[in-house]
Amino acid sequence: MLIDVESISSKIRSDMDHPNADHSPFDDEYISPQMRDYMTGRDTVRYGNRKRQAPDPYITGPIIKIYGVCPDESSICVDVYGHYPTFRLQIVKGTASKQCMMRIGNYIEKSALSHGNTPTQYNGNRPRNIVSSTMLKAFSAFPYMEHPSDFYEYRLSKAYSVRTLAEHFVKIPEMDDHESEGGVLGIIPHSCDDSLTQFMVNSGISGFGWVSTTKMASSHDAKRSDTEACTCSHMGDVRHTSIRPISDHDEIAPLRVMGIDIECIKDEGMPTPDKNPVIIIGAIACRAVNGVVDQGNMKNIIFTWSPPDSGGVGEIPRSAEESIRVIHARDEAEMFTAFGSFLTSYDPDIYVGHNVIGFDIPYLVSRANVLGVEGVMYMGRRRERSWSAPKEITKTRKNGDTRKSLRADTPGRIQLDTLPFIQNVKKESSYSLGALAQKYLGEGKDDVGYQMIGPLWHQSPETRARLCAYCLKDVKLSLGLAMHKEFEMVLSVVELSRCTRVRAAQLLRSGNQEKVKTLVLNEAKTPNFDPSNLPVFFPYETPRPRSKDDKFQGATVINPKRGARMKNQPIATGDFSSLYPSIMISHNSTHIRSFIRSH
């Protein structure tokens, strides 16, 4: 079952050695089944054979990594090669010709993608950025046209080139062309700026959908070590033509969920990773069967350390039926090392927490970089230096306010943050964990102010135990919100990802427009698409910057003309959130039909 998809550089991954992993300090109940086999020296299932099928030496396009979960809960990573992102130009003025298409291709090489460098050649005559080009006819989704238009389609060797070209040609709506009328060629860039969406649409796969592969080029049993580039149980290479969706398999593979929360010693204001240490990492490991978290089999773990000669950590308050495992380290670096070992052993599919995207995970990654602990620098299933540094994200709201935050990528693992999830579906006076837990769970947070954390940690073993219980309580509340019947976040993400055919990571951070666009692109591939089998493309649009002076006014709703469609022919609507769906249903009409009739 597909968990995540990412695109990396064009370098083909070479065969790796897979030494036996060291024995984990954790019991079998915390370890994934496949990892447990490796620790005991038992073999596991191989995918395909050892022989590598080398790609075309002149075509080393981007590698697409598919992360998934097998029915036995083991993780798998497949490198897919041979799929190239495409960039399209719609010809809205002038005459399309192969000569013009080639001239624009040369312009792309020399100006749009050259970045001041001389384009290198594959075999003496093929440019580096463009793999191939072709002319085709297709429909434009916006603006709507009754007849297909001419398009130039370019297959690119780099995934990031798609968005670069789209942004470049948006600023150049016309180009000089001696063969077109008036010597001017009008163009509109069309593209999914996300090359992974192109791959998923072309392959017919969806988020959390089942995928099969044939002719696996090579496979590796992941007898993992801390130096490997991937921590999955199985790895292999395959051509993109061998990827097939399994549409008749509706089951949801068991998912490994990990709730997480951290506590830091803060000075004034928010803590900073380069100065303020992490003193406690609280984690709850559990499983989600058919998208529903199993509440009866949760493992509570506390990672902590204490000042030298301070007496360690006292007995953590707990209920009679509750068990808590405490991993007490000598210092912060040793605590991070133990936590990294736990991540490798348990191999979670989903992280859950309140503001885990905006604080906990970026802070852990940044702090691990400061301490030099490899195991936590990469909280995803891919270990490379380029993925270890959190990125600064700037969001602009409708009122013009901007907000900056850090985000750490975790390839192969989903970050399910209860804070933005609830903000998108509920309107609350306060979105703090305490307020939300009190309203939906009937249970509030323990009252420990941030200014009290430092003194309590230094005071005594008993006060440190109180902080550990406080941290673990936050993890429980976050998981409680994720499992609450009002949200059912894991099941909601799984089913919505399958329905909209959008991968989970993109689903959680994008709006409704991306969902609708992906649905239309997938539907346009079906043989019964009206009016023909030609593809449908969306133009690339740059987001318009907003200022505080912008004013927003609600739309005026007008009743459409009756009789645009027969009453025995129902229609489907795809509006986001407005009155139009109810108007369409009551009058059995659409605004597009009325527009066509009037013109």
Positions of predicted regions on the chain:
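Common nucleic-acid-contacting/processivity interface regions adjacent to the catalytic cores
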Residues: D4, M216, G454-S598
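Short helix/loop capping segments that flank catalytic or ligand/cofactor-binding pockets
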Residues: L165, D267-G269, V292-V293, P362, ...
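N-terminal accessory regions of nucleic-acid-interacting proteins
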Residues: L2-H23, E29-I31, N129, A138, ...
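Proline-aspartate-enriched helix->loop->beta-strand connector
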Residues: F339-Y363
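Long, charged/polar, low-complexity intrinsically disordered N-terminal extensions
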Residues: M1-E153
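Short secondary-structure boundary/capping segments
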Residues: V170-K171, P273-V278, D360-G375, G380, ...
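Alpha-helical interaction scaffolds
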Residues: S203-R256, I262-F336, G340-T344
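Active-site-proximal helix-loop-helix substrate-binding element of RNase H-like nuclease domains
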Residues: M298-F303, P307-V326, R330, D347, ...
